[in-house]
Amino acid sequence: MKSKLSDFIAGLGLCGILTTFLFCALPAPAHSQSQSTPKAAAISSQAQKSFSTPQDAAAALIQAVENYDVPALLEIFGPDGKDFISSADPVRDKSVGAAFAAKAHEKNLVTIDPKNPARAILLVGNNDWPLPVPIVKKRGKWYFESKEGRDEILFRRIGSNELDAIQICRGFVEAQQEYASEVHDESGINQYAQRIISTPGKHDGLYWQNQDGTPGGPISEGIARAIEEGYTFSKPSAYHGYYFKVLKGQGPSAPLGQLDYVIEGVMIGGFALVAVPAEYRVTGVKTFIVGYDGIVYQKDLGPDSINIAKNMERYNPDKTWHRTDDQWPAEVLANAD
């Protein structure tokens, strides 16, 4: 039986579409992709592309998103849009782009502001979701006002990623509890998993492959591999904007004080997880930690968040960490069921 972590993340297929329009706003092509190629770098320094009509601007955006055309998006949004079309999570970005394009093909409409004829808004989908970046008329041409939309887009994306990270932390606790309810690898003792993906031939992680090739463990292979990438910090792709790391000990501020979770090679003293944004103030702001009691704490570790998390070995929720009660809206989770 898979844990609710699997159910929750599997449901993000639908939630991803919902949050694209509720929180994330626009697709965010890979940060490395937008900066690493000479063509993209050259485009980002050029003047922003203009259009004869707001309808032409909207059509160009929809086509660029549908084709996942990073250079075209940089042209359309200009230098002020560079940040919000850049992310460390290209897999999710492409998925978000596909969802946006699908909604745009479902229905799209450009409306002129009745109080300002030089300002237009693109509405997409049957629910007429408004793009947070307005289209404005300057000197006889129409442009996307990227500077105005930038902060709102980043705010929505960060909020979405942080809520996902909190839910994954909570699901990790449930998965560990399910794992420890059985004895694995003929160890003769109930213990917690020290890994996300098991060593080949063993059941020492939250996911493993059975001898007949079928998946085993409290989480699915897809979820395990996605989180494992974040756990290792060795891949350019984060999972929903966050990296994750299993902690194998706790500090003096944790319940029962400082102790090691691993005793003679067996993790029986507890477990903990840290979730850190892949790009500070781009994919997330807060870092989250959770222990075996299931309480998620948050803290803004600043621009050096990722290095602090890399070096973090113990779960230590001192007074600088604060409990979070942030959750996905009930209606969003209900739609994921």
Where are the predicted features?
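Short beta-strand edge/turn micro-motifs at domain boundaries
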Residues: 120-123, 127-163, 167-170, 295-299
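Short, low-complexity N-terminal intrinsically disordered segments enriched in polar/charged residues
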Residues: 33-67, 148-174, 178
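Surface-exposed, charged secondary-structure patches
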Residues: 81-131, 233, 237-240, 245-253, ...
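Boundary at the C-terminal end of the N-terminal hydrophobic targeting segment
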Residues: 24-34
